[in-house]
Structure formats: C-alpha cells, structure tokens
Amino acid sequence: MVTPGNIGSFTVWDYLVFALMLLISAVIGIYYAFAGGGQKTSKDFLMGGRSMTAVPVALSLTASFMSAVTVLGTPAEVYRFGAMFIIFAFSYTIVVIISSEVFLPVFYRLGITSTYEYLELRFNKFVRLLGTILFIIQTVLYTGIVIYAPALALNQVTGFDLWGAVVATGVVCTFYCTMGGLKAVVWTDVFQVGIMVAGFTSVIIRAVVVQGGIGPILNDSYYGDRLNFWDFDPNPLKRHTFWTIVVGGTFTWTGIYGVNQAQVQRYIACKTRFQAKMSLYVNLIGLWAILACAVLSGLAMYSIYKDCDPWTAKFVSAPDQLMPYLALDILRDYPGLPGLFVSCAYSGTLSTVSSSINALAAVTVEDLIKPYIRSLSEKKMSWISKGTSLLYGAICIGMAGIASLMGGLLQAALSIFGMVGGPLLGLFSLGILFPFVNSLGAVIGLLSGFAISLWVGIGSQIYAPSPSSSLPKPLSLEGCNFTSIESNWTSTVMPMMTTLIPETQVSSRPELADSWYSLSYLYFSTIGTIVAVLVGVIVSLLSGGLKQNVNREFLLTSEDFSYLNVLFSPCKEKGQEEKVEVLNWKARRTDNDMEQGTDNPAFNNMEMTSTEKGEKTNGITA
C-alpha cells in the first residue's frame, strides 16, 4: 500500500522531461515567427493566415480551457466531493451544439477578427467598448489563476520557488506567443494536448497497477460514496447536482465557446465554415477525453488515500496540491514520469495563457487601437500586436498574485467566467437572437446582468456557503503511518470541514448569506445571462425597438440551418420577400489570396456597404 508522507523527489530525468517540453514549445514559437516570411501583418499574427484546418484548431480549442485548473482542480474535486463532475460531459455537448449552430454562423459570415466588432455592427461603438473592457478584465483575472496553478504544482513536488515558477510560466508562454502569433499558439496547443493526455495516462495506469485493477478503484469509490452521478435535487443552493451542472455549466461554458474571443478567434481562422464547425465537434471528443481522465484520476486518488488523507494529515497545504502529490508518490520509482505529469499541468497552463494573451492582443488592436488610429501601416500594426502581447504577458504574471488569495482554483476560475461571461453571453444573445433589441436595451441589459452576477459572486466570496451545501465527503486518517503530526487531531476519522463558519462569525452573517450568496457558483453565469436578456428585451420594447430595421446579416436566420433552408425554401413565393438590408462584400483579393484561396471573408480585403433588397451592387441584385 502507498503510504502518504514518504514521497520521492524530482530526479535529473524529471527535469530533462520538463525542460524538453518547454524547449519544444519555444521552438514552435520561433519556427512560426519566421516560417513563410514571418508575421508580416497583424492578420498574420492574430489570425494565423487563412488556411487553418479543423483538427489542429479542435485540439487548440480543447487545450485552451482545459488548463492546469482542470489537471489539478478536477481530480481534487472528485476526490473530495465525488464523481458528479462527469456530468459536465452533457454540458459540453449542449455547449458545442449551441456554439456551432447559433453563434458561429453569424461570426463567420461577417469575417470579423474580434467578436466585439460585431457589437459595433449590431449596436454602436459604446456597446463594443463595454464588451471589450469586460472581456479584458475577465481574461486577465482568469489567466492569473491558470499561471498560479502549475507554479503551485512545481512548488509542491520540486521545492521550486513558487513565485519563481509563476514568472517562468508567464515568460515562456509570452515568448512563443509574441514570436509566432496564432499559428504558434495553435500548433503548440496540439503538442501540449498530447502531453496532457500522456501525463494523465501515466498516473491512471500506475494507479490501476498499484490497486490491483480498475475494479478495486471503482469498488472503493462506490463504498466511499464517490460514484454519486445522479443527484437530481433541484435545490440551487447545493454546490453540484445534475441540474446545477447541466444548466449552470451550459451557460458558463457557452460564454466561453460561443462568444469568448480566445475560442471564436480560432474557428474564425479556419479556411471554410465547414472546417470551423468540424473543429468544434472534434473538440468535443477532446473535452470528453480530458474530463474522463481527470475524473478517473480523482477516483484513483481516493482509492489510494481512502485510509490516510494527505490533506487532513497536512502532508499538503491545499487540495489543489493533491494531484501532483499523488503523481510523485506513485511514480517515484519511474524516473521521468513525475516530470511528465508536471509537464502535463504546465502544458495546460501554457496553452491557456498563450491563447488568452493572443486574444487580449487581438481585441486591444482591433477594438481599442485601429478604430482610433487609422493611419498605421500593416507592418506597424504587426509590431503593435506583438508589443501588446508582451504587455499582457507581464500583466497576467502580476495578476497571478490574486489567485493565491482566491481559494480553490477550479471554483475560482469558473466563478470569474460566470460573473463576467454570463452578462457578455446575454449581450451577444440579444444581438443575434432578438432583432428588435436596440443599443439602449443592450447597454442597460449588460450592466444589469453584470451588477447582479457581481453582487452574488462577491457575496459568495465574503460569506462562505452553508456547510450543508458544500461539505466535502468524509476522509480518514486511520491508515496513516506516522508518529507525530503538527495538528491537534484526536480522531482517526476526520471529515474535511474547510467550509465551516466559525461560531464567532455566525451572528454577523446577513440574511442573504444562506440564500442568495449560497447559490451554486455555476449559476452565476445563468443569472447574469438571464438578467441581461430580460432587461435588454424589456428596455428595447419600451424604447421603440420594434421600429428599427436591423440588417439580417447580424442575426441568426433560417438560412444558417442548411436543413431548414432545404425544407422551407420551396415554400417561398415571388413578391413575398421583405424589404431588408443585406451586406455586400466588395472583396479586393490580393495575390496571396489567389494563391491560397479561402471562402472566409475574414481573410479578404473588403469593404462593407449596406444595400436595400432589390438594389444592385456591382451588377448583382441584392
């Protein structure tokens, strides 16, 4: 039996494996900095050219948000609370369908670089500016968390200075992102997904061998109440149930995959709309695989430590250190494998941070610089894009300090996306799904949704949820083999009561602490989205939104569903078409366009003009 507290340490082979991962990542960045003549324009840097295909983009989509937060946080979540997290597989499926069928058609059709360009096309510049600012705040905070996560792992298993690791993480990914642009980010993500799967696989296989097969792991998990998949309790105060994960998780992750710049920027870079959609659906397989690996790792961790919990015994100082502790514990006799797992966690972060930096650079250049400084040449814009990437890399390193104060990494990360991503999802939904929503409704809806989600999110951080809604499952110390411990435990079985509220603070808790502030963190996004949509719709109806004529190119239409177009197009009769505006793409193809070819308007030099139905543009009737 594995005995906690007596783990090995990093060897030369582990450091070599880890260094090799960093070296390959950096080399990819250097290669794409100079391949094909380098990053000559901001489009080359931010959009990766014009010929990305589905599979590498799909793997990049998977890697971008399956970060070290997933590698470290999800197994610890399963270890403490059970395998309910596997229900996210349903959420991911719904999210991919919504993203590919609702949001992708509109963004791809318009050929935009920044998703927030859409907000100006559909509403006005002020709405675009609001959306951009919220995205920057959200992404910088989240990136700080995912930089801190692998540094924590390195600190635990190698003794490497925590903040030295934070700086190293930020510097490495900022380097290859700044050098190679989106192409470097995508292809480095492909490599790093492989490292993530390999790291998880090494831990799972060794755990199965140690425990004598998968059967004992599942048996221990069953009797330890970790196989709690089907909790249909509708109580929104319970941290994880089927409904909080499927409903709340769907809203949270749609805010990421449907409208988040880091993800949209990738599938917009695909050379055809079919390739873009395929990238999302292939990415779904990757999400399932990483989720399954993380959950199985958590169950294996419980089976191994069910009689001696390393956290309760204070062998680790935080739940997010449990997974690297397990890796070094069971892989200590196999030089190089502990280094592979740390590379796994590190790869998740490098992919996420580089994606975030590239997205931050894109929205800053497209939304905050280009609209106001139009005289800059493409070469200067390319250098500005690289400089912006470097700046955001430094900012995100600084923001990692906040992550050390936010508690559990997984919940902190998803909470940020919920509080900010929910209202933004509501804003884009207003524009794409509701033709009568006007700029006033969009602004008030966004601000209302953000205020509500921020209220509940900050309240939940100040006032911990009640123990009944978030109490981890019991863990034992009865199998520990130690003679002394720096604690005052007197029982051999000790549940981890980390969320209990000191008695001295109970009287100071407001009434909302056990209701509104105790909502599951997964509902933060749901609340923000629903409030933004409802308020936006009501304000628009009251302010004359029904009188406006919105360009159909900015809306989701039946033509965006090919099967609906086939079914209903024969039913249309001549003379019944409405008088609507359409966009006319005046493509000015360059020689490079003709050489490579693409049906994605994002990569053509074009002018957009508005023409009414029946008028002619370039000899073509609209």
From Swiss-Prot:
Tissue spec. comment: In the gastrula and neurula stages, expressed in the gastrula anterior endoderm and in the entire circumference of the blastopore lip superficial endoderm. At tailbud stages, abundant expression observed in the ventral midgut region. As development proceeds expression becomes restricted to the liver diverticulum and ultimately to the presumptive gallbladder, by tadpole stage 35. Also present in pronephros and the tip of the tail.
Annotated segments matching region Disordered: 591-622
Database matches in PROSITE patterns: NA_SOLUT_SYMP_3 (PS50283)
Spans traversing the lipid bilayer: 16-36, 52-72, 84-104, 129-149, 162-182, 185-205, 242-262, 284-304, 337-357, 390-410, 416-436, 439-459, 522-542
Biased composition range(s): Polar residues: 595-609
A biological process from GO: pyruvate transport
GO molecular function, one term: organic acid:sodium symporter activity
Glycosylation site list: N219, N481, N488
Database matches in NCBIfam families: sss
Protein name as catalogued: Sodium-coupled monocarboxylate transporter 1
